[in-house]
Amino acid sequence: GAAAAEGNVLDAKTRELIALAVAVTTRCESCIGVHADEAVKAGATEEEVAAALAMSIALNAGAAYTYSLRALEAYNAQKGE
């Protein structure tokens, strides 16, 4: 949110990519939808989203893979694909 953005040296796209990866790692389904939407609004590409999700998979193994598929679906739904 706005509090996380204030004074943050990370740009909005980077923050949302991190947030999406964290949402996958913590298995927060509603968070995945929110941050997929915000990633689209911030201009994240599918390749960037996939790279962020790959980090989540590497750190969280199998469960992150399943949730990463959901995150990509949410991203594509928000993007209109």
Task: Enumerate the predicted regions with their spans.
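Short, thiol/selenol-centered motifs that function as redox-active sites or metal-ligating centers
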Residues: 18, 22-34
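Iron-sulfur (Fe-S) cluster-binding segments and ferredoxin-like electron-carrier domains
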Residues: 33-47, 72-75
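Alpha-helix N-cap/helix-initiation sites
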Residues: 11-12, 29, 46
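Alpha-helical scaffold segments that form or flank carboxylate-/histidine-based iron centers
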Residues: 13-23, 52-59
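C-terminal structural segments of small proteins and small subunits
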Residues: 50-76
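Acidic, glycine/proline-rich low-complexity segments that act as flexible tails and inter-domain linkers
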Residues: 1-16, 40, 66-81
